[in-house]
Design a protein with these regions (language model features):
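Low-acidity, Ser/Thr- and Arg-rich intrinsically disordered low-complexity segments
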Residues: 12-15, 24
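A short glycine-rich beta-strand->turn/loop micro-motif centered on a GG-aromatic cluster
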Residues: 144-148, 168-182
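Active-site acidic carboxylates
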Residues: 25-120, 171, 180, 186-194, ...
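Cationic, low-complexity basic patches in intrinsically disordered or flexible, solvent-exposed regions
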Residues: 3
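Histidine-anchored nucleotide/phosphate-binding helix
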Residues: 66, 155-163
């Protein structure tokens, strides 16, 4: 009613109706906002196991806090390999067996066991096209990524999701991610920022 009163001096009812329609559409966009939190590869082998490092261990508490307090839907990814890993291209370039399905190293870290029943995506590559396509079909408007490693699987999934969902707001929480090294972590964040992925410092 206030908005109509403010425009009472405008003689064209068409202009009034167009403005009210625009306001209604804007409010509708707010109402249908749909958020998703994607937890990338928070598995034992990347934290305390074969490929773990101090940087990854240091962000565990931040990740757990984020997961426990988000109002978004939650999904997670699992880096997943078989016993033939040494014969794959990745295995030849990174000859460290890790995240072999069914082993303790493949499992989510104990601190995140409470989300293991949520939707998840097993992937034998850095990025998951299955995840990106699923996000498109679900109609999410905002997607935030956290996890490890920033410079490998986080950036790969952020870019893949962006490619499949160009109009979705993609963000990465830097404080809930860690890389192979601090420098590679920073480099990956800068690269994503350059591709219009929002970085939360």
């Amino acid at each position: 009613q206030k908005q109509i009163a403010m425009m009472a001096d405008e003689k064209s009812p068409t202009r009034i109706s167009h403005r009210l329609f625009a306001t209604s559409c804007s409010e509708m966009r707010v109402r249908v906002s749909k958020k998703l939190l994607v937890v990338i590869d928070m598995q034992n082998d990347f934290i305390t196991g074969a490929l773990g490092n101090a940087q990854c261990r240091a962000v565990v508490s931040n990740v757990v806090k984020k997961v426990n307090h988000t109002d978004a839907d939650i999904v997670y990814t699992l880096d997943t390999h078989g016993e033939d890993y040494p014969d794959t291209q990745e295995g030849r370039k990174l000859p460290v067996k890790h995240c072999i399905k069914g082993t303790p190293g493949w499992e989510l870290i104990p601190e995140l066991e409470h989300i293991q029943e949520k939707t998840h995506f097993e992937k034998n590559t850095f990025g998951s096209t299955q995840l990106a396509e699923w996000i498109r079909k679900q109609g999410y408007t905002e997607v935030e990524l956290i996890g490890v490693c920033t410079d490998i699987c986080v950036i790969s999934n952020a870019m893949t999701i962006k490619a499949f969902n160009p109009e979705v707001e993609i963000s990465v929480d830097a404080g809930c991610c860690a890389g192979v090294t601090p420098q590679s972590h920073k480099t990956a964040l800068d690269a994503m920022k350059g591709c219009q992925i929002r970085i939360e410092e």
